[in-house]
Amino acid sequence: SDNENAGYVCGQDLLVQKPDGGKIVIVESPGVNSVNERITGFEEAITNSGFEVVKRIEALGDSSNVKDEMTQVLSENSEIDAVMCGSDPMAEQVMAAITEAQRTNICVYSVDGSPATKTALMNGTGGMTGIGAQSPINMGKTAVKVATALLADKDYEKDNYEETFFINRDNVEMYGTDGWQ
């Protein structure tokens, strides 16, 4: 997937939602290249737009630490405007903390497009505002084409990037919440 674009489209939407800028939290996993690319794209989109990163939360392997750390950030900062999450499991933890703190005025962005985050987006829960989505189905189809070419000793593209796109409340029904797009 074009991970950088997945983060970029989230940042572009944040510029629309919060045109005056604001304070943001970034939930990342520095050891994971795809997450790094997503965060880079997001930060490129919001550069020089009045946003201040007030906290970076490093998600550990299964992201289980994110909820506790986000809860602490919320208790220490009354003016968080948005949270950018490098993946949907991170976003699920952030949304849980935001819901418990009753701070649903915070815009939450994520990358993936899992059924759980699309459901939160559709229902307007946990602050979920938008998803830089990828399509595991299309990624699988491309992998099969490459494998078939390899087995047949034919030429193939060595680098394949699947298009990423933005899902929000206006178009989430088109993608559904019962599976991946």
Which residue stretches match the model-derived regions?
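Solvent-exposed, acidic/flexible segments
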Residues: 3-7, 31-35, 59, 63, ...
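Loop/turn elements at helix/coil->beta-strand transitions in domains of secreted/extracellular proteins
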Residues: 19-23, 48-54, 78-81, 103-107, ...
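Hinge/cleft segment of the Venus flytrap/periplasmic-binding protein
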Residues: 46, 135-181
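Short, solvent-exposed amphipathic alpha-helices that sit
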Residues: 6-10, 33-52, 69, 93, ...
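Hydrophobic alpha-helical
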Residues: 42, 55, 60-120
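Hydrophobic alpha-helical segments within soluble ligand-binding/sensing domains
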Residues: 1-24, 66-67, 113-118, 134-152
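Short beta-strand segments enriched in small/hydrophobic residues
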Residues: 23-31
